[in-house]
Amino acid sequence: MITRRSWLKLMSLTLAGAPVIGSNGAANILRRNSFDSPLTLSPQNYYRYFTIFAEQERAVLGAQPQLPWQWFVDNIPFVDVPDKEIEQTYYFRWYSFQKHIRQTASGTVIDEFLDDVPWAGKFNSISAATGHHLREARWLRNQNHAESYAAFWFKPGSEPRRYSFWAADSVYAVYLATGNTVFMLKLFPKLIENYEAWECSNQDASGLFHQIDDRDVMEKSISGSGYRPSINSYMHGDAIAIARMASLANNPEVQRQYEDRKSVV
């Protein structure tokens, strides 16, 4: 029987993008949803959580929220957890997540705030949390949610560098879950351009990247601006991801360049 500790470890690593069961094994486990299998969980067994969430929302807002139950059935990975508090939290995350998915003229956007905020970009988009959003959206059965949102950031006016954002690492994480090489390689040149733009604006002769604390999504903090571990870890991760993409694209020159870059940061 799986323990609470081991389940938390598995789920944390899997949702964060670690290859805990090979490159696509974790994806296959979480995305398996063919209802003709006797081993498949029945979504109806978890419907009660969503009605509880909707009732709590109604109590706060004073209006009955829409409950798109079929969307959850069609999209989310259903899991059964021995600890029901963890299980309820898991399903609440999907309940709240779907509210942030917007369909726009530029494709799918997953916003950070339900209400429009003045510090956001077009369609209330904010690149700061996109890495987290893509790591969650990649588990949805409709791959377009993650892939369209990733592509959104490389369309005119989307400002992917308005905040620190591990773009290449996120796109590669989506690929690990979906196996869609075409999607990943289509964004490959844009991800290289994005990395080089960061080098021009935020890297100096030391090889390290500097960032303003607010733009690093840490608000105004005592640490202030400068060489921050966060932005440098993002760029290190992006260099690794681009090198791996280059390998899949049979581009040894770019692979070598970005393997060198990751060693500098």
What residue ranges belong to the model's regions?
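N-terminal secretory signal peptides and thylakoid transit peptides that target proteins
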Residues: M1-L15
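Generic, well-ordered alpha-helical scaffold segments in large soluble proteins
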Residues: T14, F92, S96, H100, ...
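C-terminal segment of N-terminal export signals and the immediately downstream linker at the start
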Residues: I21-T40
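The feature captures the catalytic groove of carbohydrate-active enzymes
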Residues: P38-L39, Q44-R58, G157-F165, E199-E259
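Substrate-binding groove/exosite segments of carbohydrate-active enzymes
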Residues: E55-K186, I192
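Active-site lining segments of carbohydrate-active enzymes
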Residues: S106-H132, Y175, M184, F188-A205, ...
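Conserved small/polar residues in nucleotide/adenosyl-binding loops
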Residues: V264-V265
